[in-house]
Amino acid sequence: MSVFAGYAACTLGAVSMLLCVSLVPQVYQQVSMLRDELTTEMEAWRLESDQIYMDMQKFGRVRRQAGGYGGYGGYGSGPSGPSGPSGPHGGFPGGPQGHFPGNTGSSNTPTLPGVIGVPPSVTGHPGGSPINPDGSPSAGPGDKCNCNTENSCPAGPAGPKGTPGHDGPDGIPGVPGVDGEDADDAKAQTQQYDGCFTCPAGPQGPPGSQGKPGARGMRGARGQAAMPGRDGSPGMPGSLGPIGPPGAAGEEGPTGEPGADVEHQIGLPGAKGTPGAPGESGDQGEQGDRGATGIAGPPGERGPQGEKGDDGPNGAAGSPGEEGEPGQDAQYCPCPQRNTNAAVSGNQGYRN
């Protein structure tokens, strides 16, 4: 029995190993298909996000041009503010506080930090929304926009170099600005008064084709031997196993010493136990004595008429009948006299 169990276990193990080996390529193929599908979807999502970003840049540029500004550093031809002569006041980075086209000249204009190469945030035409330095419209006083202008997403791979564009039209000459107030003594700050501001980077180009895999690197040094592990804590005691089979009978022990005499005590009867399972059917017993005759049952229904029976045997001869009276005279001869004591059958009693 144990040999058969060993063969069966080996066979099952071999079959299991073959099944595992045959299923590994299928699992790898499924994982590869999922990876390719995920890569395709990520590529499509990246292209859509780039297109949306380009559309947003286009809308911001159109709105900026509608406000009367030809570039990041240009000036509009809007109405002059009340705080100076015709035209807007100076608003260069790091310079004195000024007013831009369309501003009413109020004193609550935000102070622009002195950052070299970044255009200031200007307000558009009257009633419009302010324009951020990157050209995108920002939330105005009446708008409910809480956009975060900072882009925390990691930059993608650089796209291919585009074809050079055509030269744009010349901008409108700006109005000379008003001299600013004298500043306090501080470190000299380089300001761009001539030329254009440094334009922000354009939208990210589409991703390039995947490059060839690089050369295989050098084999690393052999790692250090790990520290020997510590013995684990003793496990929890296992559950109680099933009752084992009874063991072999032991050798008969020596005769013990006689026990002490005690009084015989009769204990109280114990509680009635549960009835046991019914036993097996016994052998068939011997035939018993004939019982008493039972009460006669009710008469049954009358049966159908039977067939005609055979003729019975002839009956026994009957006894002789009584003597009859004498008959009438025949009138052809006289009747002889008869003896009254003679029998008729013996032809006696008549006298010749």
UniProtKB/Swiss-Prot annotation:
GO terms for cellular component: collagen trimer; extracellular region. Residues 61-64 are annotated as: Furin-like endopeptidase recognition region. GO terms for biological process: cuticle development involved in collagen and cuticulin-based cuticle molting cycle. The keyword Signal applies. GO terms for molecular function: structural constituent of cuticle. The keyword Repeat applies. Residues 207-259 have a biased composition (Low complexity). Residues 202-259 form the Collagen-like domain. Residues 87-97 have a biased composition (Gly residues). SMART domains: Col_cuticle_N. Residues 1-29 form the signal peptide. Residues 337-352 have a biased composition (Polar residues). Residues 73-143, 156-352 are annotated as: Disordered. Keywords: Collagen, Disulfide bond, Repeat, Secreted, Signal. It is found in: Secreted, Extracellular space. It comes from the Eukaryota. Residues 156-182, 202-264, 267-290, 294-329 are annotated as: Triple-helical region. InterPro entries: Col_cuticle_N (IPR002486), Collagen (IPR008160). Belongs to the cuticular collagen family. Secreted collagen that forms part of the nematode cuticle, which functions as an exoskeleton and a barrier to protect the worm from its environment. Secretion and subsequent incorporation into the cuticle is likely mediated by bli-4, which probably cleaves at the N-terminal consensus furin cleavage site. Collagen polypeptide chains are complexed within the cuticle by disulfide bonds and other types of covalent cross-links. This is Cuticle collagen dpy-17. It comes from Caenorhabditis elegans.
